[in-house]
A protein has these predicted regions:
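Sec-dependent N-terminal signal peptides
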Residues: 7-15
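Short, surface-exposed interaction patches in beta-rich subdomains
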Residues: 166-255
Length: 255
């Protein structure tokens, strides 16, 4: 009886390896296709699941999906209100492997304006060029990554819930509010910001570097995480409870 159980376990392990190999080969050797989706009139982007989205601000609307054919077919793009919604239709096979650059799926998006980025899950949002808008809301819930090179706006709201990362390499804004709940990380580089409010609840980290013409920063820390401030501001205040730290060793305050 025990011998039969061992044999059955061995067969199941071999089948699992074979299934994984088949799915892996499907992603690696499958034909790469490019598909254009006809969607217009959006000013927000919502990503649900694991897609990677590359955004560029432009005069026109465009949505292009590129990757292995079965994965392209697995991506749904649709308009809901003011938002372009990008999501996975479902898993491909039992294991969804992507090996190497040739096996990766990417959704390329352009629009004249962008006022909201919402990422729910483990996907990625990447913008390598300037986004020029009046107000932008950037929200991440999950383990994904949002990486924005350059933003110029009047107001910027940043919210992270979970273990993901938000990196804003350059933000030129009058008003910025950033909130982190969980174990994730927010990294900000600010220019010309009159009011900055940073709130952390949990074990994550917020890093903010203040460059030219930044005025006031308010920090609220609840938990074991850290807020690390660098650069120069005119006013600084903090509220703290828990074992975390608000580091100001590299912050200069000059009223």
């Amino acid at each position: 009886m025990r011998k039969s159980q061992f044999v059955m376990v061995g067969v199941m392990m071999v089948m699992a390896v074979m299934t994984t190999s088949c799915v892996t080969r499907q992603s690696v050797f499958e034909k790469t296709v490019t598909e254009t989706r006809q969607i217009k009139g959006f000013e927000e982007i919502e990503i649900n699941g694991s897609p990677t989205v590359c955004y560029t601000q432009a005069d026109n609307f465009s949505v292009t999906v590129k990757g292995p054919e079965s994965q392209v077919e697995n991506i749904i793009t649709e308009k809901s209100g003011k938002a372009l919604v990008i999501r996975n239709k479902g898993k491909i096979g039992f294991v969804n492997f992507q090996l190497g650059d040739e096996g990766e799926l990417t959704v390329y998006v352009t629009s004249p304006d962008l006022t909201g980025i919402r990422l729910n899950g483990s996907g990625d949002f990447i913008s390598d060029r300037r986004i020029d808008t009046d107000k932008i809301d950037i929200m991440l819930r999950g383990s994904g990554d949002i990486d924005v090179k350059d933003v110029i706006c009047d107001r910027c709201n940043v919210e992270l819930i979970g273990s993901g990362d938000i990196d804003l390499d350059r933000v030129d804004t009058q008003d910025l509010s950033a909130s982190l709940i969980g174990s994730g990380d927010i990294d900000l580089h600010l220019w010309n910001t009159a009011d900055t409010r940073l709130a952390l609840k949990g074990s994550g980290d917020i890093k903010a570097t203040f460059h030219d013409n930044c005025d006031a920063v308010e920090c609220e820390l609840r938990g074991s995480g850290d807020i690390d401030l660098k650069g120069e501001v005119k006013h600084f205040s903090k509220e703290k409870s828990g074992s975390g730290d608000v580091s100001v060793g590299q912050l200069t305050v000059r009223p």
